[in-house]
């Protein structure tokens, strides 16, 4: 039995690993505080929480497979009660997420019933180079299966995704693993199938409650696994008073006056991701306008 100190050392961490005798690479990530911070300022239904957790883990794993500086957005849009689910992450493993709900979502509602007619859009935006956008139909029962299909189609590489969300010791947690055959063509389908069969035996409590090294040993104790140093994962919104003021300046003077009149002389701009409030009165707005000029 692993004690609390042992497993928490790998909370909010992402690891990459390679199999020494098989041309397959892997990644493992667990979101603890990162996931909690995402949910803290919203009252999302349980099914939406789980979906966001899946999307966050997948985004972390996707950013780790792509060696570039930039960010990735994974977004679902639909006409069901879940109008939008969006996750944005970057190469520093800073991640944020939000959802917009318009209607009743029950705890065990299926992905298709939540979204209705919708699509999954993945946007890859490197700091240098062209932006890439892929649109994926939501024709699988779970978002993990849809994303796994995306990995296979976009990279033309055999890929396995295992993502779980839930609670561990009374706190929300999301975790996942990715296995992918090496792109140099040296891997065999037999090696990949062998390793994915072992990975599929992983239990929720192992993903949620073991440090990475022990988890990999339990799954692959007959393999030689090279585990690389961890990368920290954290919730990072990126909002600021400056960004809010820039958005405010896009509104016409007439609209600003109307909003000020309706809200007792103060405009409250709340960040949709983290819930931070930015307040602007008429004096502050006039000052912003003068500095812009």
Curated annotation (Swiss-Prot):
Name under which the protein is recorded: 33 kDa chaperonin
Principal location class: cytoplasm
One Gene Ontology term, aspect cellular component: cytoplasm
Modification after translation: Under oxidizing conditions two disulfide bonds are formed involving the reactive cysteines. Under reducing conditions zinc is bound to the reactive cysteines and the protein is inactive.
Signal peptide: none
Biological process terms in GO annotation: protein refolding
Family: Belongs to the HSP33 family.
Location(s), subcellular: Cytoplasm
Disulfide-bond pairs as recorded: 237-239, 271-274
UniProt cross-references to Gene3D superfamilies, sorted A to Z: helix hairpin bin, Hsp33 domain, HSP33 redox switch-like
A Pfam cross-reference name: HSP33
Primary role: Redox regulated molecular chaperone. Protects both thermally unfolding and oxidatively damaged proteins from irreversible aggregation. Plays an important role in the bacterial defense system toward oxidative stress.
SUPFAM superfamilies: Hsp33 domain (SSF64397), HSP33 redox switch-like (SSF118352)
Entry's Gene Ontology molecular function annotations: protein folding chaperone; unfolded protein binding
Record's keyword terms, sorted: Chaperone, Cytoplasm, Disulfide bond, Redox-active center, Zinc
Entry-linked InterPro entries: Heat_shock_Hsp33 (IPR000397), Heat_shock_Hsp33_C (IPR016154), Heat_shock_Hsp33_N (IPR016153), Hsp33_helix_hairpin_bin_dom_sf (IPR023212)
């Amino acid at each position: 039995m692993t004690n609390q100190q042992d497993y928490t050392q790998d909370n909010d961490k992402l690891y990459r690993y390679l199999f020494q005798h098989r041309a397959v690479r892997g990644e493992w990530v667990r979101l603890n505080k990162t996931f909690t911070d995402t949910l803290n300022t919203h009252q999302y239904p349980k099914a939406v929480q789980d979906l966001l957790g899946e999307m966050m883990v997948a985004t972390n794993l996707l950013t780790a497979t792509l060696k570039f500086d930039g960010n990735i957005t994974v977004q679902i849009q639909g006409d069901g009660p879940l109008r939008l689910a969006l996750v944005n992450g970057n190469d520093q493993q800073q991640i944020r997420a939000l959802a917009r709900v318009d209607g009743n979502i029950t705890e065990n509602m299926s992905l298709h019933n939540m979204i209705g007619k919708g699509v999954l859009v993945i946007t890859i935006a490197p700091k240098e180079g062209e932006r890439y956008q892929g649109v994926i139909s939501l024709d699988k029962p779970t978002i993990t299966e849809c994303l796994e299909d995306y990995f296979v189609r976009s990279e033309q590489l055999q890929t396995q995704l295992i993502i779980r969300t839930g609670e561990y010791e009374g706190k929300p947690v999301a975790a996942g693993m990715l296995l992918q055959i090496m792109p140099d063509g040296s891997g065999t389908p037999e090696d990949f199938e062998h390793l994915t069969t072992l990975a599929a035996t992983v239990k929720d409590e192992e993903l949620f409650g073991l440090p990475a090294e022990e988890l990999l040993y339990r799954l692959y104790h007959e393999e030689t696994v090279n585990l690389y140093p961890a990368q920290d994962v954290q919730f990072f919104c990126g909002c600021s008073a400056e960004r809010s003021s820039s958005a405010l300046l896009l509104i016409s003077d007439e609209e600003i006056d109307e909003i000020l009149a309706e809200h007792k002389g103060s405009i409250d701009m709340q960040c949709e991701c983290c819930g931070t409030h930015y307040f602007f009165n008429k004096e502050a707005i006039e000052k912003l306008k003068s500095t812009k000029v």
